[in-house]
Amino acid sequence: MANIKSAKKRAITSEKRRQHNASRRSMMRTFFKKVIAAIEAGEKENATKAFADMQPVLDRMATKGLIHKNKAARQKARLTAKIKAL
């Protein structure tokens, strides 16, 4: 553990951020899996609705820096293509 006061504070802050980010990342993956499950089941309406729910979450995570903005764009583009192919 750190000896300097500011380093101790940073360690505590880092741990809080890590847990917060893990929670957000898990939520994002859950939304993503719902879309994939609907696509694999061949349910276009459910896939479209799940995608509409997932899109703002993905954008928010990209804005907050949890994922890169290009990754968010790439995931949205690929899922849109899969939904259109149904």
Curated annotation (Swiss-Prot):
GO terms for cellular component: cytosol; small ribosomal subunit. Residues 1-26 are annotated as: Disordered. Disulfide bonds: none annotated. Pfam families: Ribosomal_S20p. It comes from the Bacteria. GO terms for molecular function: small ribosomal subunit rRNA binding; structural constituent of ribosome. Keywords: Ribonucleoprotein, Ribosomal protein, RNA-binding, rRNA-binding. Gene3D superfamilies: Ribosomal protein S20. GO terms for biological process: translation. Binds directly to 16S ribosomal RNA. PANTHER family: 30S RIBOSOMAL PROTEIN S20, SMALL RIBOSOMAL SUBUNIT PROTEIN BS20C. Belongs to the bacterial ribosomal protein bS20 family. This is Small ribosomal subunit protein bS20. It comes from Photobacterium profundum (strain SS9). The gene is rpsT.
